[in-house]
């Protein structure tokens, strides 16, 4: 039997993106999992619930016996086939259950009996989760430079191009605004935090990291919130503000929110449904800020959005969207960001166009 991993190996597992065969039930996996994990459960949700009830009422021996009864015969063979295939596909991987207890040991023993020696995480997901939390707390203590600027200034791209940059919006699968959702569903809060910790560990391990470059985010990115330890450090960080011309910002927003999102929806759903999903996405974004816009202004912009979509469907041109996007920026997004920036003006250490800020960041 291969040697099992202990505490000293947990960070190395996250840094290396070690494949993890997570044998917890799907409901546990959905609540929180490690980035490189695949869910091949020993018991499904119903089986786990039945065993849990049995444990409370009759004790551990009866629960164990019920578990073996439920996962037997053809069911056991199907799951063994899946574990065997995953082990062969991921020879450097590792088994994981909730706490490194009976479930991962049972699967490990069954695999051993089938001729496959495969290690497990001693301490299970709980140990990896605690490692991720502690790593984030420690790494967040390094200095931080935030990239700020109005919508469309290319902040995310600038962060992505820095070797010490961490794309918080990319990890959260959300661009942080009313129109920020992507076609990928957001992760659970715990899974997002685990992914963030792994990304910070990998970035830190690649270089002698002196500071982090992050986008100036609010506490919430869609449905995910930043870990409090990182958020607290970000409120104290220096800010470099990108101030690009309005026309350049419009070009970026056209590319990102109209051309790219239209392409992505069509690619994912096909022409007809993809178009409907794209229209719904834009209307949902505008509707999300209806109360702040006021009903009259919202209705005006929604009418312009409908006209722009009609033109885009007929001609392929996205130019019509400027009729509602420009006033949305001028009357809502830009004033809101400038107001937020005024409250932390003393933290602004540099201002310039995109290339100037990128050059300044590299010099830090």
Swiss-Prot record:
Catalytic reaction list: 5-methylaminomethyl-2-thiouridine(34) in tRNA + selenophosphate + (2E)-geranyl diphosphate + H2O + H(+) = 5-methylaminomethyl-2-selenouridine(34) in tRNA + (2E)-thiogeraniol + phosphate + diphosphate; 5-methylaminomethyl-2-thiouridine(34) in tRNA + (2E)-geranyl diphosphate = 5-methylaminomethyl-S-(2E)-geranyl-thiouridine(34) in tRNA + diphosphate; 5-methylaminomethyl-S-(2E)-geranyl-thiouridine(34) in tRNA + selenophosphate + H(+) = 5-methylaminomethyl-2-(Se-phospho)selenouridine(34) in tRNA + (2E)-thiogeraniol; 5-methylaminomethyl-2-(Se-phospho)selenouridine(34) in tRNA + H2O = 5-methylaminomethyl-2-selenouridine(34) in tRNA + phosphate
Gene Ontology MF, one: tRNA 2-selenouridine synthase activity
Active site residues of this protein: 97
Signal sequence segment: none
Gene Ontology biological process terms in this record: tRNA wobble uridine modification
Keywords for this protein: Selenium, Transferase
One Pfam family of this chain: Rhodanese
InterPro entries reported for this sequence: P-loop_NTPase, Rhodanese-like_dom, Rhodanese-like_dom_sf, SelU
Enzyme's top EC category: transferase
Every Rhodanese domain range: 14-137
SUPFAM superfamilies: P-loop containing nucleoside triphosphate hydrolases (SSF52540), Rhodanese/Cell cycle control phosphatase (SSF52821)
EC number: 2.9.1.3
Superkingdom of this protein's organism: Bacteria
NCBIfam families, sorted: PRK11784.1-1, PRK11784.1-3, tRNA_sel_U_synt
Listed HAMAP family: tRNA_sel_U_synth (MF_01622)
Record note on quaternary structure: Monomer.
Similarity section: Belongs to the SelU family.
Summary of the function given for this chain in its UniProt record: Involved in the post-transcriptional modification of the uridine at the wobble position (U34) of tRNA(Lys), tRNA(Glu) and tRNA(Gln). Catalyzes the conversion of 2-thiouridine (S2U-RNA) to 2-selenouridine (Se2U-RNA). Acts in a two-step process involving geranylation of 2-thiouridine (S2U) to S-geranyl-2-thiouridine (geS2U) and subsequent selenation of the latter derivative to 2-selenouridine (Se2U) in the tRNA chain.
Matching PANTHER family: TRNA 2-SELENOURIDINE SYNTHASE (PTHR30401:SF0)
Name by which UniProt lists this protein: tRNA 2-selenouridine synthase
Origin species: Escherichia fergusonii (strain ATCC 35469 / DSM 13698 / CCUG 18766 / IAM 14443 / JCM 21226 / LMG 7866 / NBRC 102419 / NCTC 12128 / CDC 0568-73)
Name of the gene encoding the protein in the UniProt record: selU
């Amino acid at each position: 039997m291969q040697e099992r991993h202990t505490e000293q190996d947990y960070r190395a597992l996250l840094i290396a993106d070690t494949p993890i065969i997570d044998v917890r039930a799907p409901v546990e996996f959905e609540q929180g999992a490690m980035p490189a994990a695949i869910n091949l459960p020993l018991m499904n949700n119903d089986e786990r619930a039945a065993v849990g009830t049995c444990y409370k009422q009759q004790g551990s021996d009866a629960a164990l016996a019920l578990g073996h009864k439920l996962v037997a015969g053809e069911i056991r063979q199907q799951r063994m086939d899946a574990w065997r295939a995953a082990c062969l596909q991921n020879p450097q991987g590792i088994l994981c259950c909730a706490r490194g207890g009976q479930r991962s040991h049972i699967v490990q023993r069954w695999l051993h009996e089938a001729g496959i020696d495969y290690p497990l995480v001693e301490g299970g997901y709980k140990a990896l989760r605690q490692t991720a939390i502690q790593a984030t707390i420690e790494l967040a203590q390094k200095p931080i430079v935030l990239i700020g600027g109005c919508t469309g200034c290319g902040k995310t791209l600038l962060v992505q191009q820095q070797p010490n940059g961490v794309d918080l919006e990319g990890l959260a699968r959300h661009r942080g605004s009313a129109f920020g959702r992507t076609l990928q569903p957001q992760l659970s809060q715990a899974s997002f935090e685990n992914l963030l910790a792994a990304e910070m560990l990998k970035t830190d391990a690649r270089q002698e990291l002196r500071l982090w470059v992050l986008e100036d985010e609010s506490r919430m990115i869609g449905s995910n919130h930043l870990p409090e330890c990182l958020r607290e450090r970000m409120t104290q960080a220096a800010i470099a503000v990108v101030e690009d011309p309005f026309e350049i910002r419009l070009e970026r927003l056209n590319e990102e929110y109209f051309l790219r999102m239209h392409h992505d929806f069509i690619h994912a759903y096909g022409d007809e449904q993809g178009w409907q999903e794209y229209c719904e996405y834009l209307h949902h974004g505008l509707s999300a800020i209806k109360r702040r816009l006021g009903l009259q202004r919202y209705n005006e912009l929604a009418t312009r959005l409908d006209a722009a979509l009609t033109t885009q469907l007929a001609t392929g041109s996205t130019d019509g969207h400027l009729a509602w996007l420009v006033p949305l920026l001028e009357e809502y997004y830009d004033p809101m960001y400038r107001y937020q920036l005024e409250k932390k003006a003393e933290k602004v250490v540099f201002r310039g166009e995109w290339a100037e800020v990128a050059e300044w960041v590299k010099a830090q």
